[in-house]
Design a protein with these regions (language model features):
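N-terminal leader/targeting and assembly helices and adjacent pre-domain segments
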Residues: 1-184, 188, 328-423
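Intrinsically disordered, low-complexity coil segments
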Residues: 139-149, 189-202, 263-298, 334-347, ...
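Flexible, gly/proline-biased loop segments at the beginnings
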Residues: 152, 163-237
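Acidic, glycine-rich two-metal-ion catalytic cores of nucleic acid-processing enzymes
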Residues: 203-319, 326-328
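Intrinsically disordered, low-complexity acidic/polar segments
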Residues: 320-321, 374
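Amphipathic, soluble alpha/beta structural segments
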Residues: 321-323, 352
Length: 423
């Protein structure tokens, strides 16, 4: 079974392409800002007519369409590869029950499940791509951020640049910095709406895409487990294990449960509880969960494998194979998580909280690298140096924090194609 680090590496090319398209769009706008700033006001109409012809927006839309096709193809292939790996890990259960373990490609029920999940994950990606926009401050009320399509954002910035070029008595670069900062701070985002409250939610598109892919991977892993469990007659599940688990799932990871017991926290599981399982020795309540050794846990609201949970469940034959981790190993994982790290003049963080902070720092580094690149392409050396200083500062803080926590520095998560350090 592929671990989290291996999956991270597998999905990284898809994420990098998503980051690259963000910088492609920012780069086109930046180059036009530079060109407008360098041309004489009397000749501006020549460049303005070219920009208003829509050629830049057409190029952007073409690249977005190409990206979508490639991303969809790679996402579907990734889901299939993950499924094949997950299926192979279940061979020992088929062998134990003396059931033929047919090749992955010939297991029709499994293929149908994998195809459905791959299609759904791709569909979600397409929906994310359709809902992309910049979040720009309202000129009348700067406190309000409004979603603005890429084409409308382009036109607005070009209009501002033309006006700044034609207005006497102002410094062009200074005038354009406000607009550039907004684009850099926003980046291309996935925008969604709450129809009941009317509120707008947004997050960087590369972050949303990453979450979509991980959701698809979890779904296909669980789908394979559910289907294979039916095929070899599973009577229980084992919850997967990873370092630094979230607090609500930390205690149960690595433990085995009967299907009847597990249905308390996952009633919609496609493996139905086996009524023949004897659970009479367990005290059945709505808020208590028992593993196969009779240990008691509080029932939790967030289901396994949902809402950014990295766990899923293996289908198992209870009493046939021992859990993948001993109690001693599971305790060591929880102890490492709780040991955590205490920053100077700050509250103690669990290792789970440290990893969350690490992800935030990686996103911040990518963001300021975007800024340095856009400022460079716009010909604003002062702004580029300002963002470079931020890159240097945030990278140093990231390395220091990771070292203090004992976490691995993941340079591939801070990489931005095309970025070159100024100093």
């Amino acid at each position: 079974m592929l671990n989290d680090s291996a999956i991270d590496i597998l999905i990284q090319p898809i994420i990098q392409r998503q980051i690259k398209i963000n910088n492609y769009v920012l780069g086109i706008i930046a180059k036009r800002i530079k060109e407008i700033g360098e041309i004489l006001p009397s000749d501006l109409h020549k460049l303005e007519s070219l920009m208003r012809s829509g050629s830049d927006v057409q190029k952007i839309n073409q690249q977005l369409a190409i990206l979508t096709r490639r991303q969809v193809s790679d996402i579907q292939q990734l889901i299939k590869n993950i499924a094949a790996n997950s299926y192979l890990n279940m061979k020992r259960f088929y062998d134990y029950k003396e059931i033929p373990f047919i090749p992955f490609e010939e297991n029709k029920p499994l293929q149908n499940i994998v195809k459905a999940i791959a299609t759904q994950t791709s569909k979600t990606y397409k929906n994310l791509a359709k809902a992309q926009a910049f979040m720009i401050r309202d000129l009348k009320n700067p406190k309000i951020l409004k979603p603005t399509s890429i084409s409308d954002t382009y036109k607005t910035i070009i209009d501002e640049a033309v006006q700044a070029n034609q207005t006497a008595g102002i410094d062009y670069k200074t005038a354009m910095r406000r607009s550039m900062r907004q684009l850099i701070d926003s980046g291309i985002r996935y925008v969604s709406y709450n129809t009941e409250s009317g509120r707008v939610y947004s997050q960087r598109l590369d972050t949303a895409v990453r979450r979509n892919i991980l959701d698809g991977i979890r779904a296909v892993n669980q789908g394979v487990q559910n289907e294979t469990g039916k095929q070899f007659g599973a009577d229980g599940v084992e919850i997967t294990v990873h370092e630094y688990p979230a607090p609500d799932h930390a205690a149960v990871q690595g433990h085995q449960f009967t299907l009847a017991e597990y249905s308390k926290i996952s009633p919609t599981s496609s493996i139905l509880p086996d009524e023949s399982i004897d659970t009479s020795n367990y005290e059945k309540t709505d808020d208590v969960l028992f593993d196969t050794d009779g240990r008691q846990y509080e029932v939790f609201e967030r289901k396994i494998g949902t809402l950014n949970c990295r766990h899923f469940t293996f289908s198992i034959l209870i009493g046939v194979f021992p859990p993948n981790h001993t109690d001693k190993e599971l305790k060591a994982i929880l102890d490492r998580n709780e040991k955590g790290y205490k920053p100077k003049n700050g509250k103690k963080l669990t290792m789970y909280e440290c990893t969350q902070k690490q992800r935030e720092m990686e996103t911040r580094i990518r963001w300021v690298k975007d800024g340095q690149m856009m400022a460079e392409q716009a010909g604003d050396e002062d702004l580029a140096k300002e963002y470079q200083a931020k890159v240097n500062k945030y990278e140093a803080e990231y390395k220091e924090f990771s070292k203090a926590c004992g976490l691995t520095v993941k340079h591939y998560k801070t990489r931005v194609d095309g970025y070159k350090k100024l100093y």
